[in-house]
Amino acid sequence: LFANLGIAQIEQLVESQSLSLIDKMVTKLQADGLIVHINPMQEWLQPEGDIYTHSPLDLIKILLEKCPFPIIVKEVGQGFGPESLRSLLELPLAAIDFGASGGTNFALLELLRANQTAQENLSPLAYIGHTAHEMVEMVNVLSENTANQCKHVIISGGVKTFLDGYYLTSKCKISSIYAQASSFLKLALGTYEELDAYMQIQIKGLSISKQFLRIKS
C-alpha cells in the first residue's frame, strides 16, 4: 500500500520546508511507501493547474535524501521521454510507473474543462506522449547504463488485456510488472463478484500466455 502525492504538492512542501509532513502522513497511513505523480502537461492544460517552478528531478532527489521509505515515480497519461527515463533510472527509486500515452488521457479531460478557444487551439498538446511499447524500447536501450540504481518498472497506460501485459513485460529487459486501470474501474461500478470474476480471468489468461506463448525477437 503506497500513499500518493503530486510533484506540485512536493514542491510546495519543499518551499515551505515541511517535508516532515510527508513522513508523518506515510506513518499515519501505515503505508509501505510513496508514489509521486508527475503530470506537467495535465497541469498546464488544467484551468487552475499548478505550474512547476522547480525541476521535478531536483525535487525527487531532495525527497529521496529526506524520506526513509520507498518511492515510486509515475507519469499520468503522457509517459516519460528517453532523457527523463535515463535520469530517473539513475536514482534509487523503488520503481518507475510508466503512466504511458494510450490509456486515459487526463490532459485532454482537463482541457475539456477549459474555454472553447483553449480547447480549439491547445488540443494537439493533449495527444503528445510515449506509448508503453515505446517506453519499453527506451528502457531496454537504457538498461545497459551501469549508473542505473532503479531496477524495476511498472508498465501502465494503454494496457488493455493480459496479452498486452504479457507481451510488454516479456519484452522488457529489466524487472517489470504491468498495471491496468480503466477496465477494472468500469467493473468496479458493478458488483464485487463481477470485478473478481474479471480479475480471475485476467490472471488465468496471463498464466496460459506464460506457458504457451513466446514473443518474437
Regions found by a protein language model. Name each.
Residues 14, 49-52, 73-77, 99, ...:
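Glycine- and other small-residue-rich loops at beta-strand/loop junctions that grip anionic moieties
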Residues 1-5, 32, 36, 71-74, ...:
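Hydrophobic faces of well-ordered beta-strands that scaffold small-molecule active sites
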Residues 1-86:
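Active-site entrance/lid segments in N-terminal catalytic domains of soluble metabolic enzymes
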Residues 122-154, 160-217:
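Alpha/beta catalytic cores of nucleotide-metabolism and tRNA/nucleoside-modifying enzymes
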Residues 31-58, 84-86, 91-141, 183:
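Glycine/Thr-rich beta-alpha phosphate-binding loop at enzyme active sites
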Residues 26-27, 89, 169-170:
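Non-catalytic positions within long, well-ordered alpha-helices that form the structural scaffold/packing
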Residues 12-14, 106-109, 187-191:
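Short, charged, surface-exposed secondary-structure boundary motifs
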Residues 81-83, 105-106, 161-165:
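Short glycine/serine/threonine-rich phosphate/pyrophosphate-binding segments
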